[in-house]
């Protein structure tokens, strides 16, 4: 059986303890078999349609870019069951786990969206579920913690390190090392050791496939650019995958600039990091001069990650995609605008992509351009965070 390529240019690979290599080999083997199995593909497709609610809408905005010549569409992953794009690939991986005879699922989560998606898939497919979550994130994402528990998941707060996503990732890998015979590690983004970046991309690529069909039906042409936020990079690679060969379409990823790149408090390793080994892969990393992992920071827990998926690093290196950044304040402004102008409450993660799209529209009001933003999730989970910030600013 042919194997998948473990690298994207110089990025990717499989830097894990020897004990995990058989588990990763088994995962790759089963994934390749599943991709050629019509019954697996049919079951996945049915779950996406009947349970998750695909295809999701492509919504043309009415008011937010009204005084410009930009046409702005939103790919509505916020309407997916579970509230974000995460549900897509989680259903795929959970089906794979069942196929491998695994009865338990281990996951990590930042904003809690991946945890919620994993919990709902495990409830549906009768799998035992435990989710590692940084203690800080447990505090700032209490609604999602409760959702996970309601669906039968065990949520394990991680107090080590910065008590955020990277520490939850480390604990999840530790657990998997001890239990890989009976448990599948359901990784939440298009990063980590091979074959995860490829598996997650393939289980998210319907985002871009649907977008392409929908925009051609609505506008009769491809967009000038597709724009998505980038933390680990799964919603972005899901949007980009089907457009990579369409060279007329700009691929724009938006990293979190946090309090400003110059402050060091950000999560933008693609443009402002150095290549290193982290989380089982070779990828751009936020690290200090000693090579220690630096703390990443973002207003949105889901983008608060010090590295990024290897395919994004490769797309940047070969010049196929470009990567910008948006600050906390820019994301907040975009969040508020979408609420007030379109009646849609976006996730703070997705608000970073929206902020950059609005910048393109407002800075060139006379430029005719067709833009699509991947609205990767809804903002219910963020309303308390936003409320507290606006109250502090005297805007409430």
UniProtKB/Swiss-Prot annotation:
What superkingdom heads the lineage? Bacteria
Q: What is its EC number?
A: 4.2.1.20
User: Which EC class, in a word?
Assistant: lyase
InterPro entries, sorted = Trp_synth_b_CS, Trp_synth_beta, Trp_synth_beta/beta-like, TrpB-like_PALP, TrpB-like_PALP_sf
Per the record, its GO cellular-component terms are: cytoplasm
For this UniProt entry, the molecular function terms from Gene Ontology, in alphabetical order, are: tryptophan synthase activity
Q: Does the keyword Amino-acid biosynthesis apply?
A: yes
Name any cofactors this protein relies on.
pyridoxal 5'-phosphate
The PTM N6-(pyridoxal phosphate)lysine maps to 86
Q: Which reaction does it catalyse?
A: (1S,2R)-1-C-(indol-3-yl)glycerol 3-phosphate + L-serine = D-glyceraldehyde 3-phosphate + L-tryptophan + H2O
- Record's keyword annotation contains Ribonucleoprotein: no
Per the UniProt record, one Pfam family is PALP
Q: In which pathway does it act?
A: Amino-acid biosynthesis; L-tryptophan biosynthesis; L-tryptophan from chorismate: step 5/5
Sorted alphabetically, which keywords does the UniProt record give? Amino-acid biosynthesis, Aromatic amino acid biosynthesis, Lyase, Pyridoxal phosphate, Tryptophan biosynthesis
Question: What's the subunit arrangement here?
Answer: Tetramer of two alpha and two beta chains.
**What PANTHER family is this protein classified in?**
TRYPTOPHAN SYNTHASE, TRYPTOPHAN SYNTHASE-RELATED
The entry's family comment says: Belongs to the TrpB family.
Q: What does this protein do?
A: The beta subunit is responsible for the synthesis of L-tryptophan from indole and L-serine.
Q: Which NCBIfam families match?
A: trpB (TIGR00263)
Please give the name of this protein. Tryptophan synthase beta chain
